[in-house]
Curated annotation (Swiss-Prot):
Catalyzed reactions: N(6)-carboxybiotinyl-L-lysyl-[protein] + acetyl-CoA = N(6)-biotinyl-L-lysyl-[protein] + malonyl-CoA
EC nos: 2.1.3.15
Protein name: Acetyl-coenzyme A carboxylase carboxyl transferase subunit alpha
Localization of this protein: Cytoplasm
Family matches, as InterPro entries: Acetyl_CoA_COase_a_su, ClpP/crotonase-like_dom_sf, COA_CT_C
Organism: Laribacter hongkongensis (strain HLHK9)
Organism taxonomic ancestry: Bacteria, Pseudomonadati, Pseudomonadota, Betaproteobacteria, Neisseriales
Pathway listed: Lipid metabolism; malonyl-CoA biosynthesis; malonyl-CoA from acetyl-CoA: step 1/1
Length: 322
């Protein structure tokens, strides 16, 4: 698949186009231009490293939304075996925006759950662009309770712009479904590892991201609102989105500094979409490390540690002491 380049990647795109042109020339010519191709490839790699070493939060948000990034089902198929997808919330309907089911991770039975956006237009519409309705969150909770019943660790993959704000979703109790998940996940008697793989949008992301360890991919984002949404509210124009992204602190490195996540998982140079295979290897190692220390903990200790980490979210300054 040909790589889709973002606006700030245009210098890289120009080099890659030159490389492709030279490859076509080499195929139709007796001239050996392999050295020139290798030189341009090295230049492209170095330029990619340089650009990605100083991304702004707004640029990171663009990478997090890249249409070629691996999605939940890609990770499940790559790092798990024997995946058996389960459907429906047993109350209203099945929501394709959230996928989940039983699988094996390194031979251990687990429950995997995550948002799924879709690749082409047809699938994007089917999966509502990764924006779950209440039945999606209730399906996720049903699978978590099933995991608790059978003593299975839960692995969640977060990648959503946010919960769907449609009238029907609100009528069916969107806020209640999200709130219920927050409550139940905080008390789930099995290990829960959550990983933000793309967009972590507001309560729609948080509804499957309460756990014992929260990871983020290097170029993923996690925020109470999108930069465009924040800019529209504060400055009445989406053009201020880069400023909003900076102020919101949406990047993995910033959230790690604030103590809101536990680990940043490195991505391949140029983002996860540039090398799916390498990203899958990194994900598998990270999940293995996350689970290793949790599966042996007694339930009481697991719940106490989870409660303690939740209670330590957020910091404030006492104005009276200033």
């Amino acid at each position: 698949m040909k790589t889709t380049f973002l606006d700030f990647e245009q210098p890289i795109a120009e080099l890659e186009n030159k490389i492709e042109e030279l490859r076509y020339v080499q195929d139709d010519s007796v001239l050996d231009i392999s050295e020139e191709i290798a030189r341009l490839q090295k230049k492209s790699q170095d330029l990619t490293k340089t650009i990605y070493s100083k991304l702004t939060p707004w640029q990171v948000s663009q990478v997090a939304r890249h249409p070629q990034r691996p999605y939940t089902l890609d990770y499940i198929q790559a790092v798990c075996t024997d995946f058996d997808e389960l459907h429906g919330d047993r109350a209203y309907a099945d929501d394709p925006a959230i996928v989940g089911g039983m699988a094996r991770f390194n031979g251990q039975a687990v429950m995997v759950i995550g948002h799924q956006k879709g690749r082409d237009t047809k699938e994007k519409i089917l999966r509502n662009f990764g924006m779950p309705r209440p039945e999606g969150y209730r399906k996720a909770l049903r699978l978590m309770k099933l995991a608790e019943k059978f003593g299975l660790p839960v692995l969640t993959f977060v990648d959503t712009p946010g919960a769907y704000p449609g009238i029907g979703a609100e009528e069916r109790g969107q806020s209640e479904a999200i709130g219920r998940n927050l409550y139940e996940m905080s008390r789930l008697k099995v290990p829960v590892v959550c990983t933000v793989i793309g967009e972590g949008g507001s309560g729609g992301a948080l509804a499957i991201a309460i756990g014992d360890q929260v990871n983020m991919l290097q170029y993923s984002t996690y925020s109470v609102i999108s930069p465009e949404g924040c800019a529209s509210i504060l400055w009445k124009t989406a053009e201020k989105a880069p400023d909003a992204a900076e102020a919101l602190g949406i990047t993995a490195s910033r959230l790690k500094t604030l103590g809101l996540i536990d680990k940043v998982i490195n991505e391949p140079v140029g983002g996860a979409h540039r090398d799916h295979a390498q990203m899958m290897q990194g994900m598998k190692r990270a999940l293995h490390d996350s689970l290793k220390g949790l599966t042996t903990q007694p339930v009481d200790q697991l719940l106490a540690s989870r409660f303690d980490r939740l209670m330590h979210y957020g910091k404030f300054k006492d104005a009276s002491a200033a």
